Amino acid sequence: GYKVYWADGAQLPPQHAAAIADELTRIDIFTGVRSMDYEQALAEGRIELLGEDCDRRFMANVMGMVNDYETVKKVADDFGLVYTPFHGCGYKLVPEALTALGIKHLIPVPEQMVIDGNFPTVVSPNPENPEGFYLAIDLAKKNDVDFILGTDPDSDRVGIMVRNHEGEFQPVTGNQTGVLLLDYLIGAMKRSGKMPANPVALKTIVTTEMARKVAESNGVKCFDTFTGFKFMAEKKNALEESGEGKVIFSYEESYGYMLGDYVRDKDAVTASMLLTEMAAWYDAQGMTLFDALNALYEKYGWYAEKTHNLVMPGLDGLRDMAKLMKDLRENPPTEISGVKVIVRKDYTDGSVIDCVTGAKSRMELSGSNVLRYELEDGTVILVRPSGTEPKIKVYILTQGADAAAASLRRLRYFMMVRTMPRKPHSPRRTVLSSPEWEPPHSIPM
């Protein structure tokens, strides 16, 4: 397939996509269609190639997002990072942006700086998968740097790895990276005088609630959207056209970040530049991003998230997915892993049910096949079918009094989620329980 963008530069929102699909049903697409030699079409101006001029305009906007050249300059002699584009198109503009920022010690992974759609050095070029960073980790250890940056092949998503207190590199999740960047941007924009009136942050409904805590604790409103940047772009347009707010940052847990007014989609070039500026700023404070993340947990609370995929392959997969969602609606759980469900939300029709009082209400968001369960201990469980693969995605958003408590609670719900049936059943199921288990002796961050 392919992506279609509207005049504002964003992917088509559902209403426009539906209108185009409806129009396609009204025409015979072969009527009047002519073929033409590519070179002839190019010569006649029927094909327009985007060239260096487009890159220059884009990069001018990217560098206009810089908040703190001075701090980068102060640490530039000692601060360094490793970068990999995973054989993709980030190999050109990401290093250009970081060099323009003032980074002197940018260490690329040479084997992965070559565009190659076979991705010969990795099993998967997805920055969500830490296994792909093995070459970058070796390079970072040899060069004694604490920060690794990796962009996916089409350079719209970015993942980072940071050195922990044991000297090893660990991945920072999309949820955590977004929280780090949001908190940094709020401070940096205030320090540089760039903070607009009525600032707003956007996140998806399946992204950590820690983002809301960070935003609202610093005077920034936070709104939820459905998964996908077409919805974030639509919300950004609506808020700014109405004068209700100015969006300073939008992100989702799957490593996508939207910044500025010149892009209405996730953009790894701008995100990479600002993540590097952030890492340099913390370096000037004597902190790594691992230190910074722990400081944010100490300040805002210990949050923990986990996503689990219930894969339903084969010819029956789509049917089983639909049946499971239907079963959850008709026989909603009253408890999950021994904890009471206090609020149920169905984003299909926007309905909200208070399970304690029985009161019913409506929320603003509706029109997406997602179920949300809010539990007595503050945990949120969301369930939705994937739009592209034969699987049900289950999101666990929880928190605890400290790192161990948050991780333990996440593990408890994760074990329950793993036991959810791939095959829906008809008997009434009011309790979702995890099997008997023993807490681990140590809980990783």
Where are these regions (language model features)?
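Phosphate-binding and adjacent anionic-ligand microenvironments
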Residues: 141, 145-147, 168-170, 188-384, ...
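Short Gly/Thr/Asp-enriched flexible loops that form oxyanion-binding sites at enzyme active sites
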Residues: 1-6, 156-175, 211
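Gly/Ser/Thr-rich loops at beta-strand to alpha-helix junctions
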Residues: 85-91, 155-157, 206-209, 315-316, ...
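Metallocofactor- and cofactor-centric catalytic cores in central/energy metabolism, strongly enriched
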Residues: 380-382, 432-445
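Long hydrophobic segments that form regular secondary structure
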Residues: 62-66, 74-98, 102-104, 133, ...
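Phosphate/diphosphate-binding loops
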Residues: 1-28, 125-150, 179-185, 197-211, ...
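Gly/Ser/Thr-enriched, mixed-charge loops and adjacent short helices
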Residues: 2-132, 138-140
